[in-house]
Design a protein with these regions (language model features):
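Terminal interaction module
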Residues: 1-97, 140-204
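Long, hydrophobic/aromatic-enriched structural stretches that serve as scaffold segments
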Residues: 72-141
Length: 204
C-alpha cells in the first residue's frame, strides 16, 4: 500500500459570478472552521455522518480517545488538521486470504464500505482569497471530491446557501511551482518525506 499526499490551493467562488470569498471579510472562515460551536468536525459529526451520495462514500469523524484527539487547530498559523474516516461503497467484491485466494473469508455487498482513516490539513490566511489544503492519498484512493462536498456544505451553511459558494482547487505543485521552475525562477525543487509506519494508526 502506497501512501502519498496531495497539495492544493483553493478558492471559494460565489455561484454564477467571478467573485471569490475574501478571507479578510467577516465572519472569519478560519474561526468558523476551528472555534465555532458548529466547527468543521462538529458540522460533519452532526450533519454529514453517513452516506455522502454524490461521492458514493460513507463518512464519520473518529471520536476522542483518552489522552489524545484526532483533530487539532493552530490559531496563530490558522490551520485545522486531523483524521476523517471514510469508505467507498457501491461495488460487490470478495475478501480472501492472500495465500489462499480461493478461500473467500468475507463477501462485501454494495451497501458496505471498508472504512479507512485519511489525514487532512486546511489553512486559511487572514488576507487574500487562496487557502491551502493537504490531503492523504492511499494508492488510487483520494478524498478531495469528498472534502470539496463537505467544505462547500460547511461554507454555505455559515454564509448562506442562497450564495451557492463552490470550492475550486489548483494543484499547487504542478500548476504553480513547476511553471516557476520552467520559467527559471527556481533552480530546482526538492520533495522529501519521512518513512511511514506500517500501521496507519501510528502515523498521527
Amino acid at each position: 500500500m502506497r501512501t502519498t499526499i496531495e497539495v492544493f490551493t483553493f478558492k471559494i467562488r460565489k455561484h454564477r459570478t467571478s467573485d471569490f470569498l475574501s478571507f479578510a471579510d467577516e465572519p472569519d472562515l478560519y474561526e468558523l472552521l476551528a472555534n465555532d460551536e458548529n466547527n468543521f468536525t462538529n458540522f460533519i459529526d452532526t450533519n454529514l455522518t453517513g452516506d455522502i451520495e454524490q461521492a458514493q462514500r460513507t463518512v464519520r469523524i473518529p471520536q476522542k480517545v483518552e489522552g489524545y484527539s484526532f483533530h487539532h487547530h493552530n490559531n496563530k498559523a490558522r490551520y485545522i488538521c486531523g483524521i476523517i474516516e471514510t469508505g467507498l461503497y457501491g461495488k460487490e467484491y470478495e475478501i480472501a486470504n492472500k495465500d489462499d485466494p480461493k478461500n473467500v473469508e468475507f463477501r462485501v455487498g454494495k451497501n458496505s464500505a471498508i472504512i479507512k482513516p485519511f489525514f487532512y490539513y486546511i489553512m486559511i490566511p487572514r488576507t487574500g482569497d487562496k487557502g491551502l489544503m493537504i490531503l492523504e492519498r492511499t494508492d488510487n484512493d483520494g478524498i478531495y471530491p469528498l472534502m470539496r462536498i463537505i467544505l462547500t456544505s460547511f461554507i454555505n451553511y455559515h454564509y448562506g446557501v442562497e450564495n451557492g459558494y463552490t470550492v475550486e482547487k489548483t494543484n499547487l505543485i504542478l500548476n504553480y511551482y513547476l511553471n516557476e521552475l520552467l520559467e527559471g525562477k527556481y533552480n530546482s525543487i526538492s520533495v522529501s518525506a519521512n518513512s511511514l509506519k506500517k500501521d496507519i494508526a501510528d502515523r498521527y
